[in-house]
């Protein structure tokens, strides 16, 4: 059985803060996000390198991020990584709200030594993940690199975004992964920025997203 609960927030009106809890037979997760934060993070997924990547989202996206997860790591990391992506996506969707005044689109290129990645995001309301990454190793620390796709798929499906991720160069898997998450964070930061010239306006000619 799966349950996701929106935890009541004490934030004042206008704050882009949300907290979501997700409990299943495989994981117990609580996520809290502040989209207008300073990059503070408290992370506990049980997978060290995954926490390191989540920290990149907070630091480079200037998003305050609090994630607690107890997962069935005695099996493997799949449920933990995927379900954190799902819950984080739900929290983002709630925190973003009606999307009035946001820039909607964001992109970033991020290098790390020989590695270079590009991420483009659209808060379109239409979930879609388009990811072209060929990791040069099957695992980084305790993180199975196949699960990076599962994390982003979970996020995309529940945040309602279109996301393009391309690793353009790189032969060190750690560097590949880190550039992906840093570029993702900076693309989010750009897309979620408020444009004072379109305050109160939904960024679509349809009038809704």
Curated annotation (Swiss-Prot):
GO molecular function: imidazoleglycerol-phosphate dehydratase activity
Keyword annotations from UniProtKB, A to Z: Amino-acid biosynthesis, Cytoplasm, Histidine biosynthesis, Lyase
Protein name: Imidazoleglycerol-phosphate dehydratase
Listed SUPFAM superfamilies: Ribosomal protein S5 domain 2-like (SSF54211)
Functional pathway: Amino-acid biosynthesis; L-histidine biosynthesis; L-histidine from 5-phospho-alpha-D-ribose 1-diphosphate: step 6/9
Lineage: Bacteria, Pseudomonadati, Pseudomonadota, Betaproteobacteria, Burkholderiales
Gene: hisB
Any one of the GO CC terms: cytoplasm
Positions in coiled-coil regions: none
Cross-referenced PROSITE patterns: IGP_DEHYDRATASE_1 (PS00954), IGP_DEHYDRATASE_2 (PS00955)
PANTHER family associated with the record: IMIDAZOLEGLYCEROL-PHOSPHATE DEHYDRATASE, IMIDAZOLEGLYCEROL-PHOSPHATE DEHYDRATASE HIS7
Enzyme class: lyase
Subcellular location(s) per record: Cytoplasm
EC number(s) reported in the record: 4.2.1.19
Protein's GO biological process: L-histidine biosynthetic process
Protein family according to the UniProt entry: Belongs to the imidazoleglycerol-phosphate dehydratase family.
Location (main, coarse): cytoplasm
CDD domains, per the entry: IGPD
InterPro entries: IGPD_sf, ImidazoleglycerolP_deHydtase, ImidazoleglycerP_deHydtase_CS, Ribosomal_Su5_D2-typ_SF
């Amino acid at each position: 059985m799966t349950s996701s609960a929106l935890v009541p927030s004490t934030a004042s009106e206008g704050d882009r803060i949300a907290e979501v809890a997700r409990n299943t037979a495989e994981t117990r997760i609580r996520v809290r996000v502040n989209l207008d934060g300073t990059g503070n993070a408290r992370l506990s997924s049980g997978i060290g390198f995954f926490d390191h990547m989540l920290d990149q989202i907070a630091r480079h996206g200037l998003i305050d991020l609090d994630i607690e997860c107890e997962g069935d790591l005695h099996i493997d990391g799949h449920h933990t990584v995927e379900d954190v992506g799902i819950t984080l996506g739900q929290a983002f969707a709630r925190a973003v709200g009606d999307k009035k005044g946001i820039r909607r689109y964001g992109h970033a290129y991020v290098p790390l030594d020989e590695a270079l990645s590009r991420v483009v995001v659209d808060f379109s309301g239409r979930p879609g993940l388009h990811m072209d990454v060929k990791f040069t190793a099957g695992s980084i620390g305790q993180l199975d690199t196949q699960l990076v796709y599962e994390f982003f798929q979970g996020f995309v499906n529940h945040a309602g975004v279109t996301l393009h991720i391309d690793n353009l160069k790189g032969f060190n898997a750690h560097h590949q992964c880190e550039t992906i998450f840093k570029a993702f964070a900076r693309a989010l930061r750009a897309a979620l920025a408020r444009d004072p010239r379109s305050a109160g306006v939904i960024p679509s000619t349809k009038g809704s997203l």
